[in-house]
Amino acid sequence: MHEHLAQPVRETSSGDLFIEGDWFPNPLPANISLDEMAYPDTSYSFTTFFSEKPVGFSLGYASGNYGHGVFTTGKNGEINVGKFAVLQCTRIICDLSVTIKDHCMFSWGSVITDRWLTANTLSPDVRRQMLKEAAHSPTRHIESPDPQAVLIEDNVWVGFEAVILPGVTIGQGAIIGCKTIVTEDVPPYAVVVGNPGRVIRFLDPTDTEENRQQLISQLLG
C-alpha cells in the first residue's frame, strides 16, 4: 500500500518508488508496506535493509519515521509498526522480528535489536568466519546465529537513547526512561530506568477503550 501517504511517492516506469523531494537518491525497497497517512521520511532509512521477506517492513496508519531513523535487517528480518506510532531517529536492527504496536513513541537515538553478536555468545573462530563471509557478501551484513524476537505492546513510550535488547517484550502502557538498557521483559504500565533497567513504579491503567471513547466524545462535543 502506497496511496494517500503523508508524503507523495512517485512510481517510475520501471516500477521503482521514490519519495518526492527526498534528499537521498535511492528508491524505496519493493517489499515494504506503507499504510494511509504514513510518513516514511527518506529512503536513506533503508540503506541497510536487506530483508527478503514478502513484506519486510510495514508502517501502519498515520505512523511516522522522523529524523532519519535507520532500519537494518538480515534476509529473514521483519519489522512491523502499528498505527499512530512515532519513531524519532530510531535505529532498529532485526534479523528475525521486531513488532511495535499502536500508539507507541520512541524518542531520538533509541535502539531496538533482536540480535546478539558478542564475545560471550560466539567464539573467536566463529566470529572470524562470519566476518569473512560478510566480506564476500554484496550486503556486507553479518547474520546473527540466534536472533530473538522483540515485541513492544500498545501505548509504550521509550525515552531518548534507550536500548531494547533481544528477546524482550515490553507490556502495554510502559515507560522506558532515557538511556535505559532493557535486558528483560517489562510488565504493563511499569516505569523502567537504569542500566540494567529496573522497575521503579507502576502507572494507573487509564488507556482503556472506555476512557478513549469518553475522550473522543468530549472532543467531538
Language model: regions and residue ranges:
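Domain-scale signature associated with acetyltransferase and cell-envelope carbohydrate enzymes
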Residues: 1-164, 172, 188, 197-221
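Short linear motifs in intrinsically disordered
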Residues: 61, 181-182
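Short beta-to-alpha loop/turn elements within the nucleotide-binding domains of ABC transporters
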Residues: 168, 180, 186
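Binuclear metal-ion centers of metallo-dependent hydrolases, dominated by the metallo-beta-lactamase
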Residues: 176
